[in-house]
Amino acid sequence: MTFSLVLWHELSDEINRLPDKTRRIIKTALKRLEEDPFPESQGDKEKLVLRGGVVIYRLHISLSYTAFYDIDKEEKLVIVQEILPIEQAHKKYGYF
């Protein structure tokens, strides 16, 4: 099953401001989500249940970044909401 990848807000601009190598690594990792966004298939993805029962998915990208995304199974969309350096991701979401 193939999904379409959607970047939330201004993520495209943020990604394009990164160094070339980092940008390639992030784009390659995000592209893999189109084929299989679900955590069961690879260890770099995880389903998180946040406070209030909100579900979000996490993708480790290299050792430097984490992408947070949602999956719309009905529309076959992967909606990337945020890409953060690992340290910021840990501070913001705190427990993983």
Label the model's feature ranges.
Residues 1, 55, 76-79:
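Residue-level signal for beta-strand positions within conserved beta-sheet cores that form or flank
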Residues 32-60:
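A short, surface-exposed loop/turn module that caps and links secondary-structure elements
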Residues 13-16, 61-96:
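Enriched for short, Lys/Arg-rich terminal
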